[in-house]
Amino acid sequence: MCDEFIHPGLVSDSRLSRRRFGLMTAAAAGTAGSALAQSNAASTEVTVKTPDGACDAVLFHPNSKGPSSKEKWPAVLIWPDIMGLRPAFRDMGARLASQGYTVLVVNPFYRSAHAPVIGDNFDFSNPEARARLTGYRAAMTNDGIDRDAAAYLAFLDVQAVTDKGKKAGVQGYCMGGALAFRSAAAVAGRIGGVGSFHGGNGLVTDKPDSPHLLIAKTNAAYLVCQAQNDDASNPKVKDDLKAAFAAAGKTATVEVYAANHGWCVPGGAVYNQAEAERAWSNLGALYKANLI
């Protein structure tokens, strides 16, 4: 759920500067900072061909021991939130890769614009700015998302640093939570773990294409981390999710965190470090148990 009520005054702040953000987070005690994560992860700007065009994205993997290294790691696809691929998500991709994964962070709006799709003065409470992003999202049909997910996993699987013998993961933030659910169904043979972070009420709708109705078609374990203000607006979502997981016989954790929609993304107006770190820890446990 991404609207002006859930995202009051959400703007692009100075921490969208890669250098400044890295220095700030690296200095935070007890936090795996951006600078540290990037020192342990290699990144490459890539273009992923899809049936609908060409997606700009960033590929991350742990720094190998040298050009002759034959190390391989499980693949993970990251769907950003409605503000798209930007420095915060690059840093999150690097952090995950440093933990032993080959990670692809995509521009979900490639059909409409090259990333980044927001500037330093972006304000989500501005109706015109918000309408531009929702227009980008509207260009992503369900069939298109399914095609994208298949293309992204195929791209990951041809990388020399991807361990195709292990299941892949997919995680999404805000609108990306629903996209992660769709991806798990579209590439059911590959996805073993799904993470949704402040996916909001878009995970359960009254429409026939509701993401929660896809759960039975997947072969994954789930971690669903809901925001407290999303839950307050519709407390029934968590219960419907739990019921859907139980009916499908899927392993799943559904929890409401003590933080607001968007809390996992560093640099955001509602970033909550303590709850974000807890989400990282739970994601690590999900992938360790299921990307095997």
Model-derived features: positions:
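N-terminal secretory signal peptides
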Residues: 1-16
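N-terminal export leaders
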Residues: 16-29
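N-terminal cap/lid segment of alpha/beta-hydrolase-fold proteins
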Residues: 35-68
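Short beta-strand element of the alpha/beta-hydrolase
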Residues: 70-81
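Gly/Ser-rich "nucleophile elbow"/oxyanion-hole loop immediately N-terminal to the catalytic nucleophile
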Residues: 121-169
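Primarily recognizes the serine-hydrolase "nucleophile elbow" in alpha/beta-hydrolase
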Residues: 149-211
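Short beta-strand/loop motif that positions the catalytic acidic residue
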Residues: 218, 224-226
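C-terminal catalytic histidine-bearing segment of alpha/beta-hydrolase fold enzymes
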Residues: 248-292
